[in-house]
Amino acid sequence: VTFSPLSAAFALAPRLPLGVVMRAAHVSVGLVARRGGAPIERLRANMARLTGEQPSRDLLVAAVRSHIRNYAEELMLGSSRGAPLLEGVSFDGFEALAAASEDGPVVLALGHSGSWDRAGAWVCAHGRVIVTVAEKVEPPSLFERFVALREGLGMEIIGVAKGESVFGSLVERVRGRSVIVPLLADRDISGSGIEVDLGRARALVAAGPAALATKLDRPLFVACITYENETPTGADVRVRCVGPVSVPKDLAPGANRVEALTQAWVSEFAAMMADKPQDWHMMQRVFVEDLDPERLARARAEHERKNR
């Protein structure tokens, strides 16, 4: 049996008071930030490319705190002691999003920011159905915990393995249904990613939201999730949602609509995210200048080969 620290945390944390778990997460921030390492340096570089400015030491520590808080909240969501997490959520633009889903699916592009599971739980608690995709992680028992957590909150989950496409399954699952389809899409370096302007640099993001909205001929919204009213024992969640996102009116004939729609939602997301960059949990390479060009070229060639 493979030991997973995260699996152990999932088993232990819900037995503890919410305030104890959140305070423990808060206390750990200083240690993690001081230790540094590649993920912290990548976080720093990504924040700089998003905003055009090097983050201060305090801002970087705040980013580490936000990242750890998100994990701590995920451990507690769905448990009786984590029930207060469903409160303290404000959702700007929810009425328009919900109205757009009345006559069919609406796609919602998200980034890895704030607490997306907490925001999703709030949406489900307010009477809307969510269908989304979750990447399969190891060990399988950990992925099963994540799925059980989200399904317990009212979401429908389609698991996807690395390198696998579930686009067709997702289309069939949501077609004709009054559902919201949130998709984390601010990174895709697999070869199928679309190159866009993200903040102050070029980045690779997922085609999924724009491709799904185009395939279904349904609206595409975009949201940025951040924290506010932060204390050592927790924080509120703020969701800013705008849409429907549309392609430029002067889009050239023959231009790729999915690419144009992707740039449109990314521009909206980046503008909102730049207001609170410490809540963007991007500790991986996403900007083109940070990628190995030869590896990226091979990935793109392989993607093209598979899709001939």
Located regions from the model:
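Membrane-anchoring hydrophobic helices of lipid-metabolizing enzymes
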Residues: 1-110, 143-148, 154, 308
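Soluble or luminal CAZymes and related metallo-dependent hydrolases
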Residues: 4, 39, 89, 162, ...
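Non-catalytic C-terminal accessory region of glycerolipid acyltransferases
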Residues: 32, 50-53, 57, 61, ...
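Active-site metal-coordination segments of metallo-dependent hydrolases
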Residues: 40-42, 136-140, 202-206
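A conditional alpha-helix N-cap/helix-loop micro-motif detector
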Residues: 87-91, 112-113, 139, 160-164, ...
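Conserved beta-strand termini and adjacent loop/short-helix elements that scaffold enzyme active sites
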Residues: 94, 133-135, 160, 242-244, ...
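Short amphipathic alpha-helical segments and helix-helix/interface helices
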Residues: 94-98, 120-124, 143-147, 170-171, ...
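Catalytic core of membrane glycerolipid acyltransferases/transacylases, capturing the structured
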Residues: 104-162, 191-194
